[in-house]
């Protein structure tokens, strides 16, 4: 059975991002997936120290709430990184999480103990789900390479963007029910594609 881990980087409860994320996961569950959501803002964790200790042994010297989160990341089939756009990129919560993934990069390129073959990448999907207040066509551009870095280091094929721009213009997700419907459909269709023989 396909297992989805969703990391919610929004500091707001029941806002635009959390609402469309919940709809996406509801659609995924309707297609047979199991889902778990972790709100990064509810966790206590330190930011990357930039100490480069992981470059030697491939292990982060910090042990905190993110230690277990990364274990779950490496065990799931689909990883959803959900974040609203703050100052043209992901939130501080999401960026802090991604920065802590430096040890995965170190395992791939320094200690060379982490290798993903084509079969693994085929069966592990990365999804970026995001909302923005403004509707400019460049709203998500700075966030794409940030989330791609984590997906690449953790062994996920980054193939899916679920994006909703112009939330302010629409009056937010509560006044834009089509966004919820689209998110639900996207979640359902993704799991159906993954489960195709």
Language-model features: where?
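Cofactor-binding loop segments of dinucleotide-utilizing enzymes, especially the Rossmann-like FAD-
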Residues: 9, 40, 131-133
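Glycine-rich phosphate/pyrophosphate-binding loop and the adjoining helix
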Residues: 30-31, 138, 144-197
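N-terminal beta1-alpha1 ligand-phosphate binding loop
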Residues: 2-31
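N-terminal beta-loop-helix "entrance" segment that forms/cooperates
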Residues: 40-59, 168-176
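Short histidine/acidic/glycine/proline-rich micro-motifs that form metal-
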Residues: 11-14, 85, 133-137, 168-170
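A short beta-strand-loop structural module common to alpha/beta enzyme folds
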Residues: 33-43, 162
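Helix-loop-strand module that forms the ligand-binding subsite of alpha/beta enzymes
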Residues: 61-152
């Amino acid at each position: 059975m396909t297992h989805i881990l969703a990391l919610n980087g929004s500091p707001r409860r029941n806002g635009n991002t959390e609402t469309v994320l919940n709809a996406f996961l509801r659609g995924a569950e309707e297609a047979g997936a199991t889902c778990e959501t972790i709100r990064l803002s509810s966790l206590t964790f330190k930011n990357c120290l930039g100490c480069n200790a992981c470059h030697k042994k491939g292990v982060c010297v910090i042990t905190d709430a993110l230690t277990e989160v990364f274990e779950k990341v490496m065990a799931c089939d689909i990883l959803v990184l959900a974040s609203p756009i703050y100052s043209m990129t992901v939130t501080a919560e999401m960026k802090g999480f991604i920065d802590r993934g430096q040890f995965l990069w170190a395992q791939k390129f320094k200690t060379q103990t982490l290798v993903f073959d084509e079969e693994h990448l085929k069966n592990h999907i990365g999804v970026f789900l995001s909302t923005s207040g403004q509707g400019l066509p460049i709203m998500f551009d700075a966030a794409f390479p940030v989330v791609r870095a984590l997906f690449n280091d953790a062994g996920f094929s980054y193939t899916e963007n679920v994006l909703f721009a112009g939330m302010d213009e629409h009056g937010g997700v509560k006044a834009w029910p089509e966004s919820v419907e689209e998110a639900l459909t996207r979640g359902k269709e993704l799991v159906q594609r993954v489960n195709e023989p």
